[in-house]
Amino acid sequence: MEEREDAPKDFIKLKSEKLSVGEVSELVVSPYCGAVSLFIGTTRNNFEGKKVIHLEYEAYTSMAETEMKKICRDVRQKWPSVKHIAVHHRLGVVPITEASVIIAVSSPHRAESLEAVMYCINTLKASVPIWKKEIYEDEYSWKENKECFWANSEK
């Protein structure tokens, strides 16, 4: 009966408010798991010698959520022991040092959760329709994700 109360769950969220590492990691904690692995992608203050002021993210929300759910399904097929998965991505303005994406995965042992987190971030960058604009001191640039399949279809 207790196992049912801790059935595997996926927590997907796109939000414009500041992301909380504590909140996201708490979502995946389970008494059945000895590992919680995290990836936190933050805004850095420079890119190729240019000073970054902040980032701005936009998404095709419904498709992004669908793709994020698909990533969770794929993780569960590849690593059946994974318990809970949380993928939270920020939209709008993300200041320097703040998180733009937090991924948390719990599993009984570390190998599965570490591998699953790596798969999640790599697949998210390659398949989820979220776009990043870097704002510099005197210009801005929409960033093409080299891993993104639709951006590279003509190459």
Swiss-Prot record:
Q: Which Pfam families match?
A: MoaE
Can you state the subunit structure given in the record?
Heterotetramer; composed of 2 small (MOCS2A) and 2 large (MOCS2B) subunits.
Which HAMAP family does this entry report, sorted A to Z? Answer: MOC2B (MF_03052)
Which gene codes for it? MOCS2
User: EC number(s) of the enzyme?
Assistant: 2.8.1.12
> InterPro entries from the xrefs?
MoaE_sf, MOCS2B_euk, Mopterin_biosynth_MoaE
Q: Record's family?
A: Belongs to the MoaE family. MOCS2B subfamily.
Q: What is the lineage of its organism?
A: Eukaryota, Metazoa, Chordata, Craniata, Vertebrata
Provide the protein name.
Answer: Molybdopterin synthase catalytic subunit
List the source organism.
Taeniopygia guttata (Zebra finch)
Q: Where in the cell is it found?
A: Cytoplasm, Cytosol
The UniProt keyword set, sorted, is: Cytoplasm, Molybdenum cofactor biosynthesis, Transferase
What residues does substrate bind to? Answer: H109, R110, K125, K132, K133, E134
- Highest taxon above the source species: Eukaryota
Give a short account of what the protein does: Catalytic subunit of the molybdopterin synthase complex, a complex that catalyzes the conversion of precursor Z into molybdopterin. Acts by mediating the incorporation of 2 sulfur atoms from thiocarboxylated MOCS2A into precursor Z to generate a dithiolene group.
Q: Which GO terms describe its molecular function?
A: molybdopterin synthase activity
